[in-house]
Design a protein with these regions (language model features):
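N-terminal-proximal low-complexity accessory segments that begin disordered
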Residues: 1-49
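Short, structured coil/loop segments at alpha-helix boundaries
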Residues: 26, 30-36, 52, 103-107, ...
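N-terminal cap/leader regions of alpha/beta-hydrolase-fold enzymes
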Residues: 28-29, 36, 59-66
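Generic short alpha-helical segment signal, independent of protein family or function
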Residues: 44, 48-51, 118, 140
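Short N-terminal amphipathic alpha-helices
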Residues: 47-62
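Glycine-rich flavin
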Residues: 61-145
Length: 145
């Protein structure tokens, strides 16, 4: 699968057929609910900008696992340049959305887990890092949020 479009992201949420409650009331059309949709729109913006050539340098990165272009939110930082682009990307998204765009914690988490599993395997003889890398391959291939 290639990079997701904003529309594919929104449809992927609708396809989950989740049972969601807000303030004790079931929400049938959660994708279009007025309290939920603004957050969905902000996340969708991360996909929209990734598809725009003028933002490609900030929004995409070359995967160190495959060499393919991936959404920077699914990328493991490899250099100080990656970190600088991450910050510039976050500033851009903040300017475009005027809000939280919901993906920063996940990006920071995958980078931490990559490092920690590597160190755990070296110290404990476990196999977490290889398994995490396999997870990352799928995450990048399917452009998960």
């Amino acid at each position: 699968m290639a990079l997701k479009t904003a529309e594919e992201f929104v449809q992927s949420l609708a396809d989950l057929h989740l049972q969601i409650y807000l303030f004790g009331e079931q929400v049938d059309d959660y994708v279009n609910h007025p309290l939920i949709r603004p957050s969905i729109n902000c996340i969708a913006t991360t996909y929209e900008l990734a598809a725009m050539p003028e933002y490609e340098d900030l929004m995409l990165a070359a995967s160190h696992l495959t060499g393919k272009k991936v959404n920077r939110f699914t990328h493991i930082h490899q250099s100080t340049e990656d970190l600088a682009k991450k910050v510039k990307m976050q500033r851009l998204l903040g300017q475009k959305t005027g809000s939280c765009f919901q993906r920063c914690v996940g990006m920071d988490a995958i980078n931490a887990v990559d490092s920690v599993t590597f160190e755990m395997d070296a110290r404990l003889g476990t196999d977490y890092h290889r398994r995490f890398r396999n997870f990352m391959l799928r995450m990048q291939e399917e452009d998960w949020t």
